[in-house]
Amino acid sequence: MVYSFPLPVYKFGRARFCRSFRADGANYEKCPSKKETYYGFKVHALITLEGYITAFKITLASIDDWEGLRDFAENHLNLVILGDKGYTGEQLLEDMRSKSICLMSLKPSSYKTNWPKEVRQLIFRFRRRVEIVFSQLSEQMKAERVLAKSFRGLCTRLQNKILGHNLCMAFNSIFREACDIGRIKQLVF
């Protein structure tokens, strides 16, 4: 499943005084899910159905979700990728088909053709899993709390958070610990 989340580097009111990330391309963008404008970047992630993050990319905040998906498509072949409404469009579907990737994304209600109800429910169920993964990254691993002073430090910090998340998921599955998916650090820490 492919998904993206905002990564603000400064609070909105202090962003105009920011100098450290401006050279790296940090900019303003609106986040419709959080109903706020933020200054920073956007993280695109490719997540398995079990909840492991297999690939991620940090892009400018103003970059469309399609670009993050196209970068993932260059490195992966013969995949079935689930996405939300940000990954719809005939041009994107044709582009993914040419790379032998099946893209199944939720379509807005204005579309004439939509997936059957069972497929939409399946996509919603897997989307909840992805939202749990991102909430774990932001709440338990504090991924959205940026303490880095450079873009390289930001990337390193995010890599460590994602590695920690994947290790916690692996330990919980190896030891078959009865652990709620919302508390991945329960076994390790």
Predicted regions and their residues:
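Polybasic low-complexity intrinsically disordered regions
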Residues: M1-K85, G89-C102, P108
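Structural motif
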Residues: S33-E36, K149-L158
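Hydrophobic (often cysteine-bearing) scaffold residues that line and stabilize catalytic clefts
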Residues: D65, F126, C155, Q159
